[in-house]
């Protein structure tokens, strides 16, 4: 009898995490498994069997509830209950979580169900949301998540600050999962998770991979095309869209500190309208 993998992510074969889930699905199918991907928002056609969680109206309701009550991951009750009934039919051997935030899923209902059914869970950590009271990325240098979130510095984004409640609830629910493997995708995330409430769980770093047939050295005239001096040391940064979360401010600081006659800083990707252009030579 085939084993079954169920992955859960905000998107299916769309965006970075959606494409990662798609590749994992292809991999397990090549080894004889059946693959399902449950998603909440955008999708592209997939080789896995797709399950849509909720409707666009559920997303809107979840967004409003989060904005007013700081309830990210605690709305979408009806949509999540319907999804759990589908899991009952699938009976997966492993549930692999990716990004379960972003207004589409109730994690309290999901984790309670997974604990009751004792289904092994793998959770790939693409950001910091699992270890905080609501942030998916620490924008302000706050380290309360290491002990307990409270009085969130970003509470101005919400009508109410329930970061302490949210942080405690995540700890309580995750502690009940009998088989949980945490997979950070970078050493930086691993370092953060190892200082959080998840530090005692099974943590295994698996770095994001790339297609080496596409991303490999090729003969090119890029230096000439973009006016880059070959004699300089090149500092390269690559992101789909550049903003503070992707480390753009670090490149600004490097441009100020490094001598322009020795270094060239090259940024690949889309810049936001607010981004500054610094000519460091």
Residue ranges and their predicted role:
Residues 267-281:
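Nucleotide-activated donor-binding/catalytic signature segment of Leloir-type glycosyltransferases, i.e.
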């Amino acid at each position: 009898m085939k084993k079954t993998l169920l992955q859960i992510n905000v998107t299916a074969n769309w965006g970075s995490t959606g494409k990662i889930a798609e590749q994992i699905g292809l991999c397990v199918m090549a080894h004889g498994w059946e693959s399902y991907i449950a998603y909440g928002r955008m999708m592209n056609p997939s080789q896995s069997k797709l399950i849509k969680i909720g409707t666009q109206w559920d997303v809107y309701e979840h967004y409003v509830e989060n904005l007013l009550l700081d309830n990210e991951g605690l709305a979408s009750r009806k949509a999540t209950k319907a999804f759990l009934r589908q899991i009952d039919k699938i009976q997966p051997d492993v549930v692999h979580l990716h990004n379960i935030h972003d207004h589409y899923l109730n994690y309290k209902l999901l984790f309670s169900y997974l604990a009751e059914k004792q289904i092994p869970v793998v959770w790939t950590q693409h950001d910091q949301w699992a270890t905080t009271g609501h942030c998916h990325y620490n924008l302000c240098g706050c380290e309360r998540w290491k002990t307990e979130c409270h009085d969130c510095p970003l509470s101005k984004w919400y009508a109410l600050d329930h970061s302490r409640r949210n942080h405690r609830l995540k700890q309580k629910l995750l502690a009940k999962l009998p088989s949980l493997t945490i997979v950070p995708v970078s050493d930086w995330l691993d370092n953060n998770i190892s200082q959080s409430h998840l530090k005692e769980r099974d943590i295994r770093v698996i770095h994001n991979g790339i297609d080496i047939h596409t991303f490999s050295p090729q003969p090119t005239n890029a230096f000439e095309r973009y006016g880059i001096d070959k004699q300089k040391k090149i500092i390269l940064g690559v992101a789909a869209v550049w903003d503070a979360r992707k480390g753009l401010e670090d490149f600004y600081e490097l441009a100020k500190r490094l001598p322009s006659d020795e270094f060239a800083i090259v940024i690949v990707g889309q810049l936001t309208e607010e981004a500054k252009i610094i000519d460091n030579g």
